[in-house]
């Protein structure tokens, strides 16, 4: 068990008891109510306890791509830099990159993430060791080639079976067709079939740039969401669509009707000059918005607090509206909405919820005065957290990783980077 004493929880000073992996009780809890020998007691004085953040779109192993190709347009960035480097990937490199990325996320308050990438056995191994929660998809790209398509679908099915057989509630599977402009109709149709067979979500890039939208329109005569909807891609599945930058009104209606989650990646979209997602229109149409960092190659970090701040600021600026995307809304994008998108029983601090939470020491200049903590967490916090609990286990204590040797992670990452760039 874990007992957190005297922390600010849901706006007031109280205690929190974890039993197993569940928040058992919130309120005034005496130490005499628990067994001292079986309970880890955390002093929450001068601290705020918040839900763990949920990163709904990323490519975690790309933590090794940090800073390698800055200030370049998306298509040139992909074809001239990222894809050539990815051709050198192997299990060892992906393992090292995933370790580095998960440590970065945990140390900045993220307790769960939604990933699409390659070498999934290496990702699973790193996730298992660090203790983070994850939904993992193999990134499928067939480039309209039948032989490649069959290979990609076979790999995706094998990955789902591997994750299913883990019997690890922290690690779940998803299907990750890259995007409509890189995947054939046949692959996309098979994706929906597999998602329903395995009861897993679909994670896909949608409408990130004008160029890719034009490619789909030229090929099909329809915009991407219209095209996918025409053959039932969104039917009877939970779909998380990353980016959603350039959307028509009809596409937003499809998102609303099909209960699609938008994974908003404001920093990545700004860095690659892709544009700004019409989040206000999405909210007006009751389309749920979540937050993602994207990969470090286009961000260049995995600090979701930066995405929260960016989401709260950019829509005020582009809409000339100071109340567009409030601090509360932006925070919920990264907590409650993200948890709903990944079907995780978390995202808020309530009895009966999973014990995925973060403790932050408020004795910091940027978190003072403490009376305005909700504002501070969105507009002034730098993301450096003190304690992280995931699935009822302490994985970060006093800013230090508990589950793995952090120095070894940095050593492996440097070695992997040298191999990747030689």
Curated annotation (Swiss-Prot):
Cofactor: how and how many bound: Binds 1 zinc ion per subunit.
Keyword terms of this UniProt record: Hydrolase, Metal-binding, Zinc
Residues binding substrate: 86, 178, 208, 294
Database matches in InterPro entries: Amidohydro-rel, Deaminase_MtaD/DadD, Metal-dep_hydrolase_composite, Metal_Hydrolase, MTA/SAH_deaminase
Cited Pfam families: Amidohydro_1
Chain positions recorded as Zn(2+) binding sites: 57, 59, 205, 294
Reactions listed under catalytic activity: 5'-deoxyadenosine + H2O + H(+) = 5'-deoxyinosine + NH4(+); S-adenosyl-L-homocysteine + H2O + H(+) = S-inosyl-L-homocysteine + NH4(+); S-methyl-5'-thioadenosine + H2O + H(+) = S-methyl-5'-thioinosine + NH4(+); adenosine + H2O + H(+) = inosine + NH4(+)
Record-linked Gene3D superfamilies: Metal-dependent hydrolases (3.20.20.140), Urease, subunit C, domain 1 (2.30.40.10)
Cofactor(s) of this protein: Zn(2+)
Known pathway: Amino-acid biosynthesis; S-adenosyl-L-methionine biosynthesis
Any coiled-coil regions, as ranges: none
GO biological-process terms attached to the record: S-adenosylmethionine biosynthetic process
Enzyme Commission (EC) number: 3.5.4.41, 3.5.4.31, 3.5.4.4, 3.5.4.28
GO MF annotation list: 5'-deoxyadenosine deaminase activity; 5'-methylthioadenosine deaminase activity; adenosine deaminase activity; metal ion binding; S-adenosylhomocysteine deaminase activity
Domain of life: Archaea
Family: Belongs to the metallo-dependent hydrolases superfamily. MTA/SAH deaminase family.
HAMAP family cross-referenced by the UniProt entry: MTA_SAH_deamin (MF_01281)
Record's subunit section: Homotetramer.
Name of the protein in its database record: 5'-deoxyadenosine deaminase
